Amino acid sequence: MKTTNVKAFGTHAADAPLNEMTIDRREVTAKDIEIEILYCGVCHSDLHTARNDWGFTVYPSVPGHEIVGRVTKIGSEVTKLKVGDIAGVGCLVDSCQTCESCKKDLEQYCLTGWTGTYGGVDKHLGGPTLGGYSEKIVVDEHFVLKVPSNLNLAAVAPLLCAGITTWSPLRHWKVGKGSKVAVVGLGGLGHMAIKLAKGLGAEVTLFSRTPGKEKDALALG
């Protein structure tokens, strides 16, 4: 398969800092979208992975799964986006797309195993998948979201991990006007949970052991 060299920031060992490196990205196939990365959020799991805190990092590791960028190429069968559109990529870039879970749009429960944006097994090139701390990425259109261009694109990036992590249970439990939602902790996810739940019309209660969080919680609604 043809590839293109792109610049990235990654690490070759748990005790090494992030350094600039050159990585390969595949050329687009029929259902692929190539994205020029404009913004990539920093999730704490990026740090855990780079340091091999969980014990299963495959090096080289290029973190980043909160990706926002501009579509630069599309495959012949792509229908969701066009060149020039703003696109987002979250934590997954592949799955079998044929099992019961995938057919229900629950690819995170893929019965044969989903592929993470980084640290997974690259089915096209072999080796580990390499994430968004890079100039470009190529992803199957099924795992790409169209992002409205009028949004603050830097602020959109964290929604692709922390945002969807809190949005998913709110949607699953059909939270809306009259619902009551409890949020434990006011960190990166907690503040999003409060804003999203309030936006859906719920009554929200925050549980925190830190008195200093009260002012922030009230400011969030």
Predicted features and spans:
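Short structural boundary motif marking the start of a folded domain
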Residues: 2-9
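Cofactor-binding loop segments of dinucleotide-utilizing enzymes, especially the Rossmann-like FAD-
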Residues: 13, 38-40, 186, 209
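Glycine-rich beta-strand-centered segment in the early N-terminal region that forms part
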Residues: 26-40, 53-103, 108, 129-130, ...
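Cysteine-cluster motifs in flexible loop/terminal segments that predominantly coordinate metals
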Residues: 43, 91-142
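Cytochrome P450 core scaffold surrounding the K-helix E-X-X-R motif
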Residues: 45-51
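Mid-domain Rossmann-like dinucleotide-binding core that forms the NAD(H)/NADP(H) cofactor-binding site
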Residues: 135, 142, 149-221
